[in-house]
Amino acid sequence: MDHRLLEIIACPVCNGKLWYNQEQQELICKLDNLAFPLRDGIPVLLENEARALTSDESKS
């Protein structure tokens, strides 16, 4: 994931900062506890495509 892209994209739900989870290949919004998938290296920033983080994932 290009760090320059992370600087300009935001969570589509709250407009908050997204964090890259390299292991899961997801962009994480810690404010909304959502994980947005990457498909072929392209972020899918659609609320209906996001998954809710588990309570363990939210803590880390």
Swiss-Prot record:
InterPro entries in alphabetical order: Trm112-like (IPR005651)
SUPFAM superfamilies, alphabetized: Trm112p-like
Recorded superkingdom: Bacteria
GO cellular component: cytosol
Family that this chain belongs to: Belongs to the UPF0434 family.
Name this polypeptide is given: UPF0434 protein YcaR
